[in-house]
Amino acid sequence: MRATQPRGVVAAACLMTLLAVGQPTSAVDDVTLVDAARNQESPRVRALLDQNANANVRSADGSTALLWAAHWNDIAIADSLIRAHADPNIANDFGMTPLSRACTNGSAALVELLLKAGANPNARIATGETPIMTCASSGNVDAMRLLIARGADVNANEPSQNQDALMWAASERHPNVVRMLVEAGANPRAHTKKGFTALHFAAREGDIESVRQLLAAGVDINIKSLPDKAETKQDTNPSASGGRSASGTAAAAAAPRGPGYQATISEGSTPLLVATMRGHVPLALFLLEQGADPNVIDAGLTPLHWASGTWEGGVANPVYGFSEPMSGIPNRQQKIALVTSLLAHGANPNARMTKRPPGFQGLGGGYEDAPGATPFLLACAADDVEMMRLLVTAGADPTLVTETKTTAVMAASGLNRLIGESPITEAQALAAVTFLIELGADAKGATTIGENALFGAAYRGWNTLLELLIEKGADVNAVSKANITPWLAASGYGDRLGGVLYNKEGAEILLRHGADPKLGKPCQAQVRCK
């Protein structure tokens, strides 16, 4: 749904209020009229009106009989009330009007009846939402047409996030409403306070048809979600962006792909980034064919990073327009198809992550060492040999490391990935490390905090992998800045929660290969290690 949901919240609140109408405060026959409408008693409503009951009487919360008729989409009762001079513009104490309720229900017939009775097509409810915004969300084209004909402002927005009818139509996958609004003069480039446009909302839902309508209306396929008062920070140096402009028109596929080849640096997500993050592969493929820039970077990642890695977490930052959990692209064929297409359209396999995305607990099952990581390194962290092979074939450099000097072998061995429940098996890790060694990757070396590949295997009890890494030269006596050695990690004295508490076999393997048990300082993960 939308980044904020004033419409849904208010609708629910009003329903609860309507269902809890208080005791009569005026003449019995008048308030009985509200009760009759609330209970959908049409004959009783007519009888009370025949007895000259006040058609505009309000209950304790300000609700009228007409508001209840609109709530139940009861055309007959609404017609009887209007004939008795019920005012269609009376709102209850929460600002809810009959027209707003009719739009919530998507009832063109009731919308028409209320408009003919003089309902204000631009009346706002308490949140600032207008009828056309509500109707755009419910998706009734006929109701929309009636509102537009009566002068509804197609560019009205609510004050909380500056969301408008076009955005709501796109977020609910109503391409026909999107087209109608654009034809009626809605601004397709309008954005929320967080920078999301209708195109971003359509991309977030994977709605190809709404995306088509918005692109046809002239929206830039690479439009960025720039928050209010934010300035774009974009590196326009062709060598830094791989020869691809922000509009994605240059042929970046032929650009050099070494460590210096960087993604287009900018603030703000593009529709392609949003679609890829949400796992909407058909839409992402469509956007690439339409010229979307595959190398734009936001929140530290490019589309290729999102597509290549395994994601287990959730983004709660409202700049993305959502707060639901995310799990990447579960369909394997679609995942490979998207990565293949990104590479074919010039995505840089050596692009470096600039930061860890906010709110995430996982890059490949909890991978912690994001800054500097390439798509290839993320595939290594997930022990995804098929993806690793695909990226290497496209020019990925397996020797690139993160800012903390984590190598591909370390990532594949489980280093810097949260320990605990994980779908990754030792067999997968062995296959990934073996593939890397065949590529000539070095199993030696340590990160800036002194850990090497042995730490990941020791913590997890991946002892066959442990022996392979030792055979390839990994130092069994490496000491981290926390004074932990691989032997201490295997013996249950490491500084990681959730690891194998005592990997006896691993500890013995390390001792046989020369590990010094006197090195380092035993630590319990629950206590800060010094």
Where are these regions (language model features)?
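Bacterial N-terminal signal peptides
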Residues: A11-A20
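N-terminal segments that cap or nucleate solenoid repeat domains
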Residues: S26-W68
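Start-of-repeat signature of ankyrin repeats
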Residues: D29, G62, G95, G128, ...
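Ankyrin repeat A-helix N-terminal signature
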Residues: D35-N39, W68-D74, R101-S107, T134-N140, ...
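Ankyrin repeat structural motif
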Residues: S42-L49, D74-I82, S107-L115, N140-I148, ...
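Ankyrin repeat boundary/linker residues
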Residues: S59, N92, I125, E158-S160, ...
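Terminal, low-structured helical/coil segments at or just beyond the last alpha-helical repeat
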Residues: Y502-R512, D516-K530
